[in-house]
């Protein structure tokens, strides 16, 4: 593991305890407006001091999190359909590693649908994401659903 990967992981996982408290607010990308998260900036900001990292989508990061935020960002890079489509679990890559780098994220997150109809598709897209992220020293988090 290279220095960049170690450094990014050390931002997310407390080196002294090996633990982390991740605040995930990426639900709106497929669930639509989520009760309590309609005003994401107002909801998230007071909770940031208690979080070791914040997982969210590219749009939420750009529009609701200030650049002065020092909480490590885990960027959701998978998606596809919304609750309006019966193929909700058919996800793919939605954000490039170049965008992740431009946004200065500490890690990326990708949903894999274990046991679902599209399990193979999500696993293959996940491995592509891992390969691309490793080129830049960016950790990849598998989110199981």
Predicted regions and their residues:
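Conserved N-terminal beta1-alpha1 strand-loop-helix module at the mouth
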Residues: 1-75
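Expand to "…catalyze enediolate/carbanion chemistry for C-C bond making/breaking, isomerization
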Residues: 6, 133, 140
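Active-site mouth loops of central-metabolism enzymes
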Residues: 24-38, 76-94, 115-119, 144-145
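Non-catalytic positions within long, well-ordered alpha-helices that form the structural scaffold/packing
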Residues: 47-48, 101, 134
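Short beta-strand segments at enzyme active-site cores
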Residues: 56-57, 106-112, 138-145
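Active-site-adjacent beta->alpha loops and helix N-cap segments on the catalytic face
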Residues: 57-73, 88-93, 114-137
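Active-site gating/metal-coordination segments in enzymes
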Residues: 96-117
